[in-house]
């Protein structure tokens, strides 16, 4: 874990340098950190827009004073019933109801406080859990979330990671749920057609310049997909501040000399292409809408 004082230092530097937003996320679970509410509150006090990606298993005393002030909170559930949840997460089946109850509490508090915080859920569809997708979405809608984000499993095998006809059946279950449950207060966001599997055919990775991923090991990485891998590592904050890291010539060289072609697959290809277009001094068809 990042020590609390170091986390505060990073946030202070980020705010001073003009960073606009921060996502508290994994790998790992942010709310396991004992002082996470203090860190969250400090980020808010600095004027940073904050968001949280959480498994929803933990709500510590005082969360009501912090989470409603976040821009969004998204809970990763990825299961339609307690047995599937226990199997995939390797935890007691009772945790599933705890998670759903916690999500319900957060949604209720956001509504009570008339907060603008958007509370949603994330659901990764796999060859193992797709059977209960319909029931899972129904349960999540009942908690009061505004949306559930349905995503495909990110695998270097692409569509081949779904054996037989499980891919088609997965998509069908998501569509069935969307047709049934979409209304003015709830949306099934279907992103299941975005399966990782495209190797970049360009060199410039613009995403690494816009989003900085700081791991729990205090290493800085190019993105969440290359986190905790040598390919993604861009130096460390263990012996320097975040501000020093940003101004470091070594950091600049590692960013400049990196080729996106080094990645076998990239889930951020479309974002990189947009960044390349926006930063191109002479983009094609710029005068046409």
For each feature predicted by the language model, list its residue ranges.
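Conserved alpha-helical substructure of the radical SAM core
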Residues: 1-65, 69-71, 165-169, 177, ...
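Radical SAM enzyme [4Fe-4S]-AdoMet core and its adjacent flexible, acidic
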Residues: 2-5, 12, 16, 46-49, ...
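Flexible loop residues that form catalytic
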Residues: 27, 56, 78, 153, ...
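Short, well-ordered turn and helix-capping elements at secondary-structure junctions
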Residues: 28, 192-195, 249-250
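Acidic-and-aromatic substrate-binding clefts and catalytic sites of carbohydrate-active enzymes
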Residues: 30-34, 57-60, 126-131, 199, ...
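Residue-level marker of regulatory loop/turn positions in helix-turn-helix DNA-binding domains and
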Residues: 32, 206, 255
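Flexible mid-to-C-terminal extensions adjoining Fe-S/redox cofactors in radical SAM and related proteins
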Residues: 199-202, 219-289
């Amino acid at each position: 874990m990042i020590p609390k004082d170091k986390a505060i230092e990073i946030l202070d530097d980020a705010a001073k340098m003009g960073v606009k937003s921060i996502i508290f996320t994994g790998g790992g679970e942010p709310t396991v950190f004992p002082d996470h509410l203090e860190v969250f509150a400090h980020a808010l006090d600095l004027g940073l827009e904050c968001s949280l990606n959480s498994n929803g298993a933990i709500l510590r005393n005082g969360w009501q004073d912090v989470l409603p002030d976040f821009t969004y909170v998204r809970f990763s559930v990825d299961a339609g019933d307690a047995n599937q949840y226990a199997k995939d997460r390797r935890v007691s089946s009772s945790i599933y109801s705890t998670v759903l109850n916690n999500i319900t509490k957060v949604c209720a508090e956001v509504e009570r406080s008339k907060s603008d915080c958007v509370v949603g859920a994330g659901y990764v569809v796999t060859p193992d859990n797709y059977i209960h997708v319909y029931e899972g979405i129904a349960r999540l809608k009942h908690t009061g979330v505004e949306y559930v984000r349905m995503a495909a499993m990110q695998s270097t095998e692409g569509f081949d990671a779904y054996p037989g006809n499980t891919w088609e059946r997965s998509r069908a279950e998501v569509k069935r749920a969307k047709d049934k449950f979409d209304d003015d207060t709830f949306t099934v966001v279907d992103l299941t057609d975005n399966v990782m599997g495209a190797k970049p055919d360009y060199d410039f990775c613009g995403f690494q310049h816009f989003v900085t991923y700081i791991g729990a090991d205090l290493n800085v990485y190019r993105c969440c997909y290359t986190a905790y891998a040598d390919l993604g590592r861009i130096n460390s904050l263990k012996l320097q501040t975040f501000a020093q890291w940003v101004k470091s010539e070594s950091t600049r060289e590692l960013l400049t000399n990196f080729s996106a072609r080094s990645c076998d697959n990239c889930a951020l290809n479309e974002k990189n292409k947009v960044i390349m277009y926006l930063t191109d001094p002479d983009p094609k068809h710029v005068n046409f809408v």
